Amino acid sequence: MLYLLVYVDDIVMTGNEPHFLPTLIAQLSAAFELKDLGPLHYFLGLQITRTSKGLFLSQSKYAQDLLLKVNMLSSKPAHTPCAPNSRLIPTEGSFQSNPHEYRSLVGFVHYLTFTRPDLSFAVQQLCQFMSVPTDVHLIVAK
């Protein structure tokens, strides 16, 4: 069995029958111009490490880049993504005149849930206020 993951002009190929990969690459090369970058290490914000037990996925570089982007690289980490039983209030705080920063930040954190499902509840709470976020919501998101 072979798997192809295609994103725009990038293709990741893998499968449990490694001898089929060169044949597939040769067939694709006959139709398209290809550049083989070797074993997969990084793809769409995911770090991929191959071990004897399989593939290990991580987003540590993506998370570091996000912290750098929002100027929080030296922030103290929290033990949990949000306080248990906490709920955000729609009208708490003043509405943001440009909600783009909040929406972008929540989108970036949402992407982290691929490898950090423990963030899902907190992200779901933040997503409820995408249309009219307040300054309090932005602080909580950070």
Question: How would you label these PLM feature ranges?
Answer:
Residues 1-142:
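Long, low-complexity, charge-biased intrinsically disordered regions
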